[in-house]
């Protein structure tokens, strides 16, 4: 079973399913959705002491997310939504819970794990599930 340390490295996005549907479900606008649909970002995962860093790089927008496992924090999404977020790691899977703060926003659960040498992520909000696959760069 994988440990969080196995996630460390640079990953390139190679496959996406239902990403536009997921973005629509959480309220991302049409122009941003269309731009994001064609991106092939790089995800860099690092550990600095007890702080995990997930940095995503693309031609459209770069994002940085830092967290400590088991500690709730306020997260600002790339399109300016705000969440109370919590990361946990159990049975080889990293779970990222984004709990809405504003009534008109939607909560999500993002799950990350390793499978056959790939980094797999699912994003779920309501009944919509997106799957993304990343390969080591």
Swiss-Prot record:
Family: Belongs to the calycin superfamily. Fatty-acid binding protein (FABP) family.
Keyword Cytoplasm recorded: no
Pfam families: Lipocalin (PF00061)
Natural source organism: Caenorhabditis elegans
Name of the protein this chain belongs to: Fatty acid-binding protein homolog 7
Alphabetical list of CDD domains matching this protein: FABP
Chain segments annotated as transmembrane: none
Cellular component, GO annotation: cytosol; nucleus
Record gene name: lbp-7
UniProt cross-references to Gene3D superfamilies, sorted A to Z: 2.40.128.20
Top-level taxon of the source organism: Eukaryota
GO molecular function (one): fatty acid binding
Transport found in the keyword field: yes
GO biological process: fatty acid transport
Keywords from the named record: Lipid-binding, Transport
InterPro entries: Calycin, Fatty_acid-bd, ILBP, Lipocln_cytosolic_FA-bd_dom
């Amino acid at each position: 079973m994988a440990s969080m340390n196995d996630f460390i490295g640079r990953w390139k996005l190679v496959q996406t399913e239902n990403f536009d549907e997921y973005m629509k479900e959480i309220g991302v606008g049409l122009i941003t959705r269309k731009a994001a649909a064609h991106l092939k970002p790089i995800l860099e995962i690092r550990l600095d002491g007890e702080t995990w860093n997930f940095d995503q790089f693309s031609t459209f927008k770069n994002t940085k997310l830092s967290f400590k496992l088991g500690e709730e924090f306020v997260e600002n999404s790339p399109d300016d939504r705000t969440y109370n977020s919590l990361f946990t790691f159990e049975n080889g899977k990293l779970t990222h819970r984004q709990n809405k703060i504003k009534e008109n926003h939607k909560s999500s659960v993002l799950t990350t794990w390793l499978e056959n040498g790939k980094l797999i992520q699912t994003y779920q909000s309501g009944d919509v599930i997106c799957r993304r696959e990343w390969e080591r760069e």
